[in-house]
């Protein structure tokens, strides 16, 4: 499949079922994580309703883990995972070295005690295994809005308050640099092979604005149980054309979020 065809497949998969802010963010993440080779068995931590997993694992994954029982019901209906478990990622019910690959997309920033989860990933991942994750980074709040415009209007105080509200509403606990995240991984034996920023300032602004464009999606979810009750209105060439540039944009020098690809060291981590 060509890169252009891959982008269209990913965008359409999200446009059929997700509000616009998730379409932008998740499509970029799906493109990045789809480029990784995952030996089996695969564990997806924070699998949620299974939609993202169905996009990056078109042939299915082995195990999905999430504490949200309602989300797991949706994931079960999709049939992406051979096994689903509602468990705490900081105390996973799996034997050591059970998996050859672990994936966790846009989950870590929502977990207060993230060190416990990272240690558990190192435990259940076999030596040489692949670990791939995406997180929000140190530039997330900075790039989310046009800070200069707020400052010109004399609204620096309200702007700070708005960002605090937005991150509280989004349940964000961690806004760390690549070095801080890398140190966390390396301490438990997850060796960082490469990392990259994504979601440039321009894409971050579009992601932010689309939260408010997506308010009708929220109403639809509450009324019908679906974010997109009429997929033909969004899953079409017009919206693919409008959003493709965010998914295909080159790696930015600095971005709102960070993707990491790691491998599990065979030797014990240095204490």
Model feature map: region roles:
Residues 1-91, 253-260, 268-270:
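Conserved N-terminal segment of class I S-adenosyl-L-methionine
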Residues 103:
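A conserved beta-strand element that flanks and buttresses the S-adenosyl-L-methionine
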Residues 132-159:
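Conserved class I S-adenosyl-L-methionine
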Residues 149-150, 183, 194-271:
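A C-terminal cap/extension of S-adenosyl-L-methionine-dependent methyltransferases
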Residues 164-180:
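Acceptor-substrate binding/catalytic loop of class I
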């Amino acid at each position: 499949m060509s890169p252009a065809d891959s982008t269209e497949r990913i965008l359409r998969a999200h446009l059929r079922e997700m509000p616009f802010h998730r379409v932008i963010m998740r499509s970029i993440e799906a493109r990045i994580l789809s480029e990784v080779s995952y030996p089996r068995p695969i564990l997806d931590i924070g699998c949620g309703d299974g939609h993202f997993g169905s996009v990056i694992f078109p042939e299915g994954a082995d195990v999905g883990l999430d504490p949200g029982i309602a989300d797991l019901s949706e994931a079960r209906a999709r049939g992406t995972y051979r096994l689903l478990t509602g468990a705490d990622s900081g105390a996973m019910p799996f034997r050591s070295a059970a998996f050859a690959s672990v994936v966790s997309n846009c989950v870590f920033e929502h977990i207060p005690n993230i060190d416990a989860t990272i240690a558990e990933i190192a435990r259940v991942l076999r030596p040489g295994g692949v670990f791939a994750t995406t997180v929000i980074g140190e530039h997330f709040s900075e790039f989310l809005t046009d800070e200069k415009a707020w400052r010109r209007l004399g609204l620096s105080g309200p702007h700070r308050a708005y960002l605090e509200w937005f991150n509280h509403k989004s349940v964000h606990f961690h806004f760390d640099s690549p070095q801080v995240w890398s140190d966390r991984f390396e301490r438990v034996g997850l060796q960082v092979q490469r990392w990259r920023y994504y979601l440039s300032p321009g894409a971050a602004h579009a992601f932010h604005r689309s939260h408010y464009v997506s308010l009708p999606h929220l109403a639809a979810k509450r009324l019908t149980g679906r974010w997109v009750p009429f997929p033909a209105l969004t899953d079409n060439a017009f919206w693919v054309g409008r959003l493709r540039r965010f998914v295909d944009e080159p790696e930015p020098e600095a971005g709102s979020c960070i993707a990491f690809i790691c491998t599990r060291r065979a030797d014990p981590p240095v204490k």
